[in-house]
From Swiss-Prot:
Gene3D superfamilies per record: 3.30.70.2490, 3.40.47.10, 3.90.25.70, 6.10.140.1410, NAD(P)-binding Rossmann-like Domain (3.40.50.720)
Taxonomic source organism: Gibberella zeae (strain ATCC MYA-4620 / CBS 123657 / FGSC 9075 / NRRL 31084 / PH-1)
Pathway: Mycotoxin biosynthesis
Listed GO CC annotations: fatty acid synthase complex
Name listed for the protein in its UniProt record: Fatty acid synthase subunit alpha
Length: 1598
């Protein structure tokens, strides 16, 4: 009964309570006031299913009691059963763990005191810093409602990306938008949603006027709604985490006593702040608010007084602090909703950490012991360096032989080389030793063709050299014993580089062999050695096909000199080096390029001879089969010359001494032992490996050299072990005692005393060359064969081994030298040719430093008599109206502009002028004209100043001061995140989807954002409105909600060709609004266009309309990918809900850049074509511009391409495996700058880059008339697609069609320029005769008929003259430079060259697409080779290949334009830039005998024409033929026309140079046009009148 009664009473009580609740109003607000104010409750617990009342209490406390609580330092603790059950029941303190078993007695653990439950953070105002507290309250300010004007200004400012205060309220929306109709329409649309109705033509009203009109008709609700939308973004994306709009309002209320209305005004101004990134702390946010509040007060004329503060002790808690008194670390961590099993797992993890710590301590003790015993030097000295990925191979001597030949011939033709020069003879010797059938073909062609041009004497010298080289090469290939060069025996080519006179000294050598247990002199071997040495001196080594392992070949070492002999001999050499680095590899690669003869190979690998593992790995690599990644060698020679210098007596032996002993003795033996094992396991009947052991006469005679003498003496024991151990069949030992070798790392400190030592002791000291030559003789048969039979000791120490008391002699000499140096004035030691200038007394020292000559580098005009007159056959044969020339070039790229890029491409370094331009581009310097600051003297100054310090920088100091920084932040390099919105490839961000397994903590969000969360997550989110309409809501994501969490991965494409760091379009003069709105790739194109016009000598684009109609200026600028940054914003930023301009879509289109070029610079109404040809875009653009002008549709056309680089595109290129894997390249020891290696054996993908390139095309008539510079003639340009396939990026051979023609086409009479010239003359004579006859008939009719007036006769006469001109044009079309277009049996390439009297043999060089991908480079060279072969290029006439992308990377749409610019610069300077990353040209390219791949830049005696090819994804193949401008000048009517053009050109160039220099100083190279060249009234008349031309700056009488 008792239980039933309790149940009945419970049901009744519940019913009554529910009835009471439903029947009576809830007075929770009053209840809270009673609890919080009257009762002063500071700890409340809510028991219920959710935290409803707790959340309401938090908001009430935050709004009404936060200041009260802060002043009294009384924090309130609010808890709910739903969220804080564990704390309420103190469950977090009941964590049990298994006690650790131990035999030791345990002391009793004192009972822990009860722990207080942690307080829950309450959203109160931030408390002051410790030591500060509120003392005086600010003055209350009268509040005002939200103003319509503020909402309008904020809306406009946010859309225009300007600050609130930058909006001129007297201007209209249309004026503020600057003619951007899309932006204007969007603003009107946004305002119409707020102000309904919006007055008609609101966009034309001033902001102030519009505000007054709409202020009375708009509800406050709409204004507050608009306010919420305007301010939400900045709090979501730019404020620190947890800092909400409520916090901002509370700060303004507490700190400044501002009401809601004025808070709204300040927040609207804050919404227009342009912050580069999210603020990190609340302090930064409040400082920003305070700054805006003060500015607002000044604007409104208010006197605001902030809250003052006085010292006070720090509060114990704050709104962002959780305190759990007395909890352990584990308990504190597990109190955050961590279950007991998870807590136990943490405890177990702690146990494992303790175990690991104990083991680490033990290991550390052992390491400390080893470090104490062995020392740091020894431990570091045994670390392995071996890395198979880093191994480099060099074997393309076939290409370097051709390079040497062409460098030599061009040097002779320029008069820079004499034939009796020893270096010239050495070069010739090396050419002979590397000769092959292909090289002899080249020599024969050069000898018989007109390629050798210039001074007759120099040409004769070059031909003599060629004749001798041909003879010697043929003899060499036929193994003739005596080869002669200019009457001299063919010498060892290294002799020319030797110091001293090799061979002039007597040879002192001692050779010992073992006989009856003792070592005795062997006179027969001494004679044999001398014979070998004579052979080496006369003809060098001959070890073709022999394999050699060499260690110790560092700079200035004997090994390095010996390596030269080995490479000349044709040996295959593996150099194992401990100083492996890009620099070391480059040194060795240059060594191979210079000395590697036919059949030779150089392999370079990282190796530490102090590491046992490296010794074993090295030998394993040598003997392993090629199929297994090894060399597959059976070694012939081992030369272990690695050595380490030492110092110290026996009581100073240290870690370094033991390391050196290990390197020079212990591991030499290990290395040989490993070789013995592999020889033993390999094939039988192989010759033993001949080992050249480096011995020393220093058996302690020098002293103070650590264990050096002991190490060398220990090696000698190996000669005896040959008899006592079982490896005689595998190793043959030759111990060689090496004497005093000057300049090596071991002996360089003794060089100063060497000469005196020779005088006093008779000991001979050697240069490195002399010693290497003597060592090389030991490798020559039959002496080397004797070593296989028995060990041999050879003493070539120059008598040093027999000298006693050498140390005391050295001490005496050093003491005497020191005494002489202290007693003799320094200048008396100088040789007689060194003169010390002393300033004259009273003569002031010059303070003038040289100035840089900043200029545009216009092409140099050729001399008429020497260069143009011989081509006079072309005179009158060309229709200049239909001839296309390039008059301007420019680019924006990783190396700045076209001028600075050319300096790096051609010379590998910047000039002073180049450094100044780059420093200006990167914002390192600015030009200043005015008084300096007081701290710098306050004087008047004009010149460069440092951009940061404002300190003056002289021109001459710029290179020294900034070049290192310029190089580091230009070109291909590690991606710099600041250049791409923080993109860091080492931390590429992706999003990972996660389903919540528990409820998250609540957070505040603006109402609109909270509703959006509800829209997405539905029942998986709780959203509780604030107490007022605009107050933040409380949002909590529930279990089951899906969220996206950022994650980062290491992206393996971290190198790129980015624009120079600091590049800014504003620096050129591009307006701020344009930079903010326009895509970056478009900014590249705008700047490049301005510079291309300037390089055309055009300082004002509107000048064009003085010479042509506005419809005759074309625009063909294209892009491979379009607006990548805009695409990123439209998709990624929109998805992330980041601020994005509303008209971003317009920047996505590929034709937008061309539109901006026209809108801001040209104002043309001519044809506009936008090519989208992926990587071939720029050359396709050239074709379009070429067609516009040849078709008469334009007289000027802009062509080129542009593309940006984004992480999204980079990632997708990587997925296609098109770009180089930079992680793998780094593992191979490559620097970022050498990761693009076109045409090399190790090429592995392109390096992406960004930028733009623009050319100005013009008809030849217009170029001559305007006096524009001419960089080249576009003789032809075309595109071709490929065959059926399934791969879009796959390279094809469609461009072979550019050489399509039938067999025997080269015999076509039309290809004979003299034949065509004769035909043109006859046709023109006939036309002239017809004209004269027609005019005579017209005169007769006029005389006979009175009905025909004089005016009519004049019109008829004019018609007849025009008809004659058109007939002449038709003749030139059929027989002039386009004669071939109507003859299908003549290929475009042949026709384009023949038009200017050139043949396929006159195509001097080709600029290759050369992306550094395996397939492209192989396919492209194959296509060019086939074209040249099909067109009948003469055998032995290779074309130079330019592969520019090694330097710039691949910029997609701009790539072809950069190539055109570089090729034009080569054409006009005669200098072919080399590919400095071409360390080893791929062997599969050797068969392309019409192509040559230079590493060094080659200065030629002049160039005639070139081909450029470009290939793009999507079956786009493009090619163009460009000819030197001198052929156009020859086509002019006479010399006078050329000289008139020269005068116009000089005037234009001076004007452009002046504008350029002023533009750099004033940052106005780009001047955006504000108005079209005609007035609004003139527009229709100008567009409709083809004869309309500007006069000066205006159109008149249109």
């Amino acid at each position: 009964m008792e239980a039933e009664r309790e149940t009945e009473l419970s049901q009744l009580l519940l019913t009554e309570l529910l009835s009471y609740q439903f029947a009576n109003p809830v007075k929770w607000i009053e209840t809270q006031d009673v609890l919080l104010k009257e009762k002063e409750i500071n700890h409340m617990i809510e028991i219920g299913p959710s935290s409803t009342l707790t959340n309401m209490a938090k908001r009430t406390i935050s709004k009404k009691y936060s200041e009260h609580d802060a002043a009294l330092r009384e924090p309130r603790l609010l808890q709910s059963f739903d969220e804080h059950a564990a704390e309420i029941y103190c469950e977090t303190m009941q964590i049990r763990t298994q006690p650790h078993k131990s035999s030791a007695p345990q002391e009793p653990v004192p009972k822990a005191a009860p722990k207080a439950a942690p307080p829950v953070p309450v959203a109160t105002a931030p408390l002051p810093e410790p030591g500060r507290q509120v003392s005086t309250m600010p003055i209350n300010v009268e509040d005002v409602p939200i103003q319509s004007r503020d909402v309008i200004v904020a809306t406009v400012a946010q859309k225009l990306r300007k600050h609130f205060l930058d909006i001129d309220c007297s201007k209209s929306i249309a004026q503020l938008c600057g003619g951007r109709s899309t932006m204007e329409n969007e603003l009107v649309g946004d305002l119409s949603l707020i102000f309904d109705p919006l007055p008609d033509r609101a966009e034309e009203m001033g902001i102030s006027e519009l505000s007054q009109i709409v202020s009375g008709s708009t509800s406050t609700t709409k204004l507050l709604t608009a306010h919420g939308k305007l301010t939400a973004s900045i709090f979501t994306h730019k404020m620190p985490g947890g800092f909400t709009i409520t916090d901002a309002r509370k700060h303004l209320e507490v700190q400044w006593r501002l009401g809601v209305g004025r808070q709204n005004a300040i927040l609207l101004r804050m919404a227009t702040e342009v912050l580069p990134s999210r603020l990190k702390t609340r302090e930064e946010a409040t400082m920003l608010l305070d700054k805006i509040a003060e500015a607002y007060a000044d604007e409104q004329g208010l006197k605001l007084q902030p809250m003052t503060e006085v010292p006070m002790s720090a509060p114990t808690t704050s709104s962002e602090t959780k305190v759990i008194s007395g909890c352990s670390d584990v308990e504190l961590y597990t109190s955050n909703d961590i279950s007991l099993p998870e807590s136990e797992a943490l405890v177990n993890a702690q146990k494992m950490l303790n175990i690991v710590k104990t083991e680490n301590d033990t290991l550390q003790e052992k390491m400390d012991l080893l470090t104490t015993e062995l020392g740091d030097d020894f431990i570091q000295g045994i670390l392995p360096a071996w890395s198979p990925a880093k191994i480099r191979k060099y074997e393309s001597c076939w290409n370097w032989a051709l390079q040497d030949l062409l460098l030599l011939l061009n040097s002779i033709l320029r008069g820079e080389t004499s034939l009796d020069n020893s270096v010239t003879r050495s070069t010739c010797d090396m050419i002979v030793r590397r000769s092959n059938d292909r090289l002899i073909d080249v020599m024969r062609y050069m000898l018989s063709s007109n390629k050798l041009a210039g001074d007759e004497l120099l040409v004769s010298m070059a031909k003599s050299v060629l004749a001798m080289l041909i003879e010697d090469s043929q003899n060499w290939l036929s193994c003739a014993q005596t080869s002669r060069f200019f009457g001299h025996e063919l010498h060892n080519p290294i002799d020319a580089y030797a110091q001293g006179t090799p061979g002039s000294d007597s040879v002192e050598v001692k050779v010992k062999t073992r006989s009856q247990g003792t070592w005795k002199y062997d006179t027969s071997l001494i004679d044999l050695y001398k014979s070998s040495l004579a052979c080496v001196r006369e003809d060098g080594l001959r070890l073709k096909g022999k394999t050699v392992l060499l260690t110790g070949a560092g700079p200035s070492s004997i090994g390095r000199e010996l390596l030269q002999h080995l490479l000349v001999s044709g040996a295959l050499v593996l150099v194992a080096t401990s100083r492996f680095s890009p620099t070391a590899c480059r040194e060795l690669q240059n060594l191979y390029m210079k000395w590697g003869s036919s059949g030779s190979q150089l392999v370079v690998c990282p190796f530490n001879q102090g590491s046992r593992g490296d010794c074993e790995s090295l030998v394993q690599y040598i003997f392993s089969a090629k199929a297994k990644g090894g060399l597959g060698w059976d070694l012939d020679f081992v030369i272990p010359f690695a050595a380490v210098s030492e110092e110290g007596q026996i009581d100073e032996l240290d870690s370094k001494s033991e390391k050196a002993h290990r390197i020079m003795l212990t591991n030499v033996l290990r290395l040989l032992g490993s070789i013995k094992q592999h020889k033993q396991a390999g094939p039988r009947n192989t010759s033993p490996v001949k080992v050249l052991l480096p011995l020393s006469p220093n058996h302690g005679v020098f002293g103070r050299d650590g264990l050096y003498a002991e190490s060398k003496a220990g090696l000698e024991m190996l000669l005896n072990k040959w008899y006592s151990e079982d490896w005689t069949s595998y190793l043959a030992i030759c111990g060689v005692t090496i004497g005093w070798v000057r300049g090596t790392g071991l002996m360089a400190v003794n060089d100063a005393v060497a000469a005196e030592v020779e005088v006093r002791t008779g000991v001979k000291t050697f240069s490195q060359f002399e010693m290497a030559q003597r060592l090389a003789a030991l490798l020559v048969n039959p002496f080397a064969h004797e070593v296989e039979i028995q060990p041999v000791k050879v003493d070539i120490s120059g008598g040093m081994a027999d000298t006693t008391d050498l140390r005391s002699i050295l001490s005496d000499i050093r003491r005497e030298i020191k005494q002489d140096s202290t007693s003799t004035p320094t200048h008396q030691h100088l040789p007689s040719h060194h003169h010390v200038d002393e300033p004259e007394i009273g003569k002031p020292l010059s303070s003038v430093s040289p100035m840089a000559n900043l200029k545009l580098n216009f092409p140099q005009l050729p001399d008429y008599e020497d260069d143009i007159s011989p081509l006079n056959t072309l005179s009158g044969m060309v229709d200049l109206d239909r001839t296309v020339v390039i008059t301007g070039i420019s680019e924006v790229g990783p190396w700045g502009n076209s001028r600075t890029r050319w300096e790096m491409e051609a010379f590998g370094e910047f000039s002073l002028e180049g450094c100044i331009e780059m420093a200006w581009i990167m914002g390192l310097i600015t030009h200043y004209n005015g008084k300096l600051g007081d701290d710098m003297g306050g004087e008047q100054y004009t010149g460069w100043v440092d951009a940061k310090t404002k300190a003056p920088v002289a021109d001459v100091d710029v290179k020294a001061r900034y070049e290192e920084q310029i190089i580091e932040h230009s070109g291909i390099r590690l991606v710099e995140p600041e250049l791409d919105n923080g993109y860091d490839p080492r931390k590429k961000q992706l999003l990972h989807e996660i389903v919540l397994t528990r409820d998250l903590a609540p957070f505040a969000a603006p109402p609109e954002l909270a509703k959006q969360f509800m829209q997405e997550h539905g029942e998986k989110v709780d959203a509780i409105p604030g107490s007022t309409e605009n107050e933040d809501w409380t949002v909590r994501l529930r279990k089951g909600a899906v969220i996206l969490v950022p994650k980062a991965l290491r992206f393996d494409r971290s190198a790129a060709g980015q624009i120079p760091q600091g590049w800014d379009a504003r620096r050129y003069g591009v307006p701020d609004w344009a930079v903010d709105q326009i895509g970056r790739e478009t900014l590249f194109a705008l700047v490049a266009t301005a510079e291309s016009l300037l390089s055309s000598g055009i300082v004002d684009p509107y000048e064009l309309y003085q010479y042509m109609h506005v419809s005759e200026v074309g625009n063909c600028v294209g892009s491979g990918l379009g607006g990548q940054q805009a695409l990123k914003k439209a998709f990624r930023y929109r998805y992330h809900d980041k601020p994005v301009q509303s008209d971003v879509l317009q920047e996505v289109f590929s034709n937008t850049a061309a539109a901006w070029i026209n809108m801001l610079l040209l104002s043309s109404s001519g044809p506009i074509r936008t090519p989208v040809g992926a990587c071939a875009t720029a050359v396709e653009s050239l074709e379009l511009g070429y067609e516009l002008i040849t078709a008469g549709k334009a007289k000027i056309a802009l062509v080129g391409g542009h593309d940006d680089m984004t992480e999204e595109v980079a990632y997708e290129f990587a997925k296609m495996r098109a770009t180089v894997n930079t992680d793998e390249e780094e593992a191979r020891g490559r620097m970022y700058s050498e990761m693009s290696r076109p045409m090399t054996t190790t090429r592995d993908g392109f390096v992406e880059s960004q930028g733009s390139g623009i050319q100005v095309l013009a008809s030849a008539t217009m170029a001559i008339k305007m006096g524009l510079p001419i960089y080249g003639i576009v003789s032809w340009a075309g595109t071709a697609s490929d065959k059926t396939g399934r791969s879009v990026p796959s390279p094809g051979k469609g461009t072979l069609t550019n050489a399509r023609e039938t067999h025997g086409a080269d015999k076509n009479l039309l290809l004979d320029i003299h034949f065509r010239k004769d035909r043109i003359t006859r046709h023109q004579q006939q036309i002239q005769a017809d004209l004269e006859q027609d005019l005579k008939s017209l005169e007769q009719r006029f005389a006979m008929s009175r009905s025909i007036t004089k005016s009519e006769v004049d019109k008829m006469s004019l018609f007849l003259h025009k008809e004659a001109i058109e007939r002449n044009k038709q003749v030139l079309k059929s027989l002039g430079h386009t004669f071939w277009t109507s003859h299908t049996d003549i290929s475009p390439i042949r026709g384009a060259l023949s038009a200017w009297g050139l043949s396929i043999d006159d195509l001097d060089f080709v600029s290759l697409h050369g992306t550094s991908t395996v397939l492209n480079d192989k396919n492209e060279t194959s296509v060019i080779q086939s074209q040249l072969s099909h067109l009948g290029r003469t055998r032995g006439n290779p074309a130079y290949c330019i592969t520019q992308k090694y330097l710039t990377g691949h910029s997609k749409g701009a790539a072809g334009a950069w190539m055109i610019n570089g090729a034009l610069q080569a054409l006009n300077t005669g200098l072919i830039p080399g590919n400095r990353n071409a360390d080893d040209v791929a062997p599969e390219l050797e068969g392309n005998d019409f192509l040559f791949f230079p590493h060094h830049s080659v200065q030629t005696n002049g160039l005639r024409a070139f081909s450029i090819t470009s290939f793009g994804f999507g079956q786009k193949g493009a090619q163009a033929i460009i000819v030197h401008p001198r052929y156009l000048y020859a086509a002019l009517s006479d010399a006078e026309e050329f000289h008139q053009y020269r005068r116009r050109l000089n005037v234009r160039q001076r004007r452009a140079t002046k504008f350029f220099q002023r533009g750099l100083a004033t940052e106005t190279l780009f001047i955006a046009k504000e108005e079209p060249p005609y007035t609004e009234k003139q527009e229709s008349r100008v567009l409709l009148n083809p004869e309309a031309r500007m006069e000066g700056q205006h159109y008149k009488d249109v």
